[in-house]
């Protein structure tokens, strides 16, 4: 009997809410055993696992030990030294901190490098485009400098010699010189920045990797989506997520470990692969995230799992492996039936859809499960798909004022005295359809309140003055 109780207690059952640990990962300090985002000088992104004693390779930028960056705040920039060591610096392009520099041969900042040659020009009209001939330093010379050692000042030495060998550098404007210097620093300096891997940063990573995987969604659109959906701690939401779990991760961040998210999917198992970077405890994920397939959602009465409960005597007679299998099947049946009961109960605090499904055919089954005055938010990368859904909502009358929203953040290049947008940027972002769930009155509307009582008296027609004088005569 004791072994039966022990096997049953070892199952993955949902613990009590009060006994659950909240978010254990650090959002401010670089801590071990969690994921982080590396931002390279070339503006590339890399996700790393901060395992103590591990070694991270950044390709041409070098290799470093994980222990050297632990304990620093997120957002700290490092420079790779010899023997897998790193030192903290201010930024990708700024000079290293005096307290963290061990040698006196400090690198030059962009202002110091700009002053190496003569004064800059007021404009670029004196520059003659002769291609690569304007640079005396050849690619073979650069390769020799790279092979001379893996020290931290090799990149700075290459940049200095490239500026000294550039015949037209003094003919550039000061702003053009700084842009040239920044490009070379991004290419040759062995630096990187460690950032916290939140949902926004994870979306940036997938945008650089494959925009179709996140359905062309931008960061500002993700923020607008969560804002219109009114995602908050303690809520109960219905979600369709075809981005691999990025929307689910963003919702869990906002909900701070409190609430429930029912994720509807069309496969045997949901695709939440992005949650592996969230570093949330498994117990927290199991408690907050509930999955249900569309067959269970549309036909809940027929899809409930019927489980035959065995008696204690029958359980005692089972072998250890069969007993564990029995408890797993029992727990699975309870989990599925509890999610189906939750959907049948309805009254969700909001509905979010980020998918390629045809929503006009699916909304009639989803809208009844949404609570009154709750938001219905649908994202699509194509506006035409949302126009059809908006027309369907307008005729349904169970969703109030469906509106299509669009947001764009355009980066600008700032120059002293003038400012203009960056010439090249991605044309993605997507569109959001937002409405409010309402309950229309089935019968006619009855007016309430006092009326005016009396109709306005008509003013007598004014008789022309000439006609009145003739009548008096």
UniProtKB/Swiss-Prot annotation:
Which keywords describe this protein according to UniProt? Nucleus, RNA-binding, tRNA processing
Q: Which family does it belong to?
A: Belongs to the TRM6/GCD10 family.
Q: Quaternary state and partners of this protein?
A: Heterotetramer; composed of two copies of TRM6 and two copies of TRM61.
- Per its database record, what is this protein's job? Substrate-binding subunit of tRNA (adenine-N(1)-)-methyltransferase, which catalyzes the formation of N(1)-methyladenine at position 58 (m1A58) in initiator methionyl-tRNA.
Q: Where in the cell is it found?
A: Nucleus
Of the GO CC terms on this record, one is: tRNA (m1A) methyltransferase complex
Q: Where are the transmembrane segments?
A: none
**Region entry Disordered, spans:** 1-25, 445-473
Which species is listed as the source? Debaryomyces hansenii (strain ATCC 36239 / CBS 767 / BCRC 21394 / JCM 1990 / NBRC 0083 / IGC 2968) (Yeast)
Give one GO term, molecular function aspect: RNA binding
Question: GO biological process: what's one of them?
Answer: tRNA methylation
**What name has this protein been given in UniProt?**
tRNA (adenine(58)-N(1))-methyltransferase non-catalytic subunit TRM6
Q: Does the keyword RNA-binding apply?
A: yes
Keyword flag Nucleus: yes
